[in-house]
Amino acid sequence: MSEIEKYHWVFRIHVVDRAGALTSIASAFSNEGINIGTVVGHGLEEPALVEGSVVLTFFSSEEKKDIMVRKIQRLSKVIRLEERPYDSHSLRKSAILHTTRKLKPLDVAGENSFLTCELVGSEIEGFTYFLAGSPSELDPVLHKLEKNGVVKDIVYSILGL
């Protein structure tokens, strides 16, 4: 029996009210046996007329992804859903890195584009950087830094454009 090919997907889900929206979205994924890789919420701290959004990543077959599109769109708090493959050029990924040493320009050079790299702070324990770029450019840089033992800690998110 051949294994079904899984792809990396990104959903940006626009919601009316974030209270309970994330729970219902996570439940829909859990019911289908799909693990959410990354989840980021965007909204305002004070109640407003502006919609919030939830951006998440996951791996699944195209068929399961289509099932999730239909399930998520039917949720009462969902206004609309945007779906993209993880390697879409319209997506951007950002990361906050705690490193063991100061980064050099070659440490953060993408293969086909420049990445944003900003030194946020330095302390005795190391350095803190903000990095951003397309996932296809940023991921190899992050993996290289991790492999070389430069990364102490990392927090990242996906932002749909």
Task: Please provide the spans of the model-predicted regions.
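Long, contiguous binding/interaction regions
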Residues: 1-9, 14-51, 59-161
